[in-house]
């Protein structure tokens, strides 16, 4: 999320309730899973939607978390109510896919699949991802320290409380020019 502000589990529960009450179909974008609090923690929202017995889409990108930017590696998962519905959805997805591309590149997908299905490689990848996550946190702390040194007044803790690669700074133009 480009603001760095993630919903709390309580806020997600409210979103789930609205989706359920209104009969909506949610689309969850997991482009930065693992950069916030960890792979499982960042993906916990999926469990909330599953527990509510909802139908929804999950778009997962591996371009950032695997540093495969040029490969554009990702997946679309669709949670359906039963196998008949899944078959109908798959049929429609195949039509959409066929009109967009016939043979997508496979190198990046093979790299991701190999890492995720090889326990030693997966553990190493998760360790590296944790290192990236900690570096982002350290950079946020350094930014706040530099802003304080530059004389920026006011509350800045929200910058270190935000997660991931993006941050909504809330700084004015004058503060940015310091």
What are these regions (language model features)?
Residues 5, 34-43, 95-102:
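Alpha-helical subdomain
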Residues 8, 19, 39-42, 52, ...:
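Active-site-proximal structural scaffolding
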Residues 124-177:
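Conserved PLP-binding catalytic core of the aspartate aminotransferase-like
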Residues 1-35:
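Active-site phosphate-binding strand-loop segment of PLP-dependent enzymes
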Residues 14-16, 43-56:
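Short, electropositive alpha-helical surface patch
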Residues 12, 42-46, 90, 140:
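Amphipathic alpha-helical segments in well-structured domains
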Residues 51-126:
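Conserved core segment of the aminotransferase class I/II
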């Amino acid at each position: 999320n480009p603001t760095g502000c993630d919903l709390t589990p309580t806020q997600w529960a409210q979103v789930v309730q609205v989706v359920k009450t209104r009969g909506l179909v949610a689309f969850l974008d997991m482009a930065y899973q693992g950069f916030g609090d960890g792979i499982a923690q960042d993906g916990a929202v999926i469990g909330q939607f599953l527990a509510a017995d909802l139908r929804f889409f999950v778009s997962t990108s591996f371009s950032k978390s695997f540093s495969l930017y040029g490969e554009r590696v990702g997946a679309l998962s669709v949670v359906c109510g039963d196998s008949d519905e899944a078959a109908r959805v798959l049929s429609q997805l195949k039509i959409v896919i066929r009109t967009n591309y016939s043979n997508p590149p496979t190198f990046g997908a093979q790299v991701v699949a190999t890492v995720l299905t090889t326990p030693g490689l997966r553990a190493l990848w998760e360790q590296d991802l944790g290192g990236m996550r900690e570096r982002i946190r350290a950079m946020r702390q350094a930014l706040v320290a530099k802003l304080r040194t530059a004389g920026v007044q006011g509350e800045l803790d929200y910058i270190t409380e935000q997660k991931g690669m993006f941050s909504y700074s809330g700084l004015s133009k004058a503060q940015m020019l310091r």
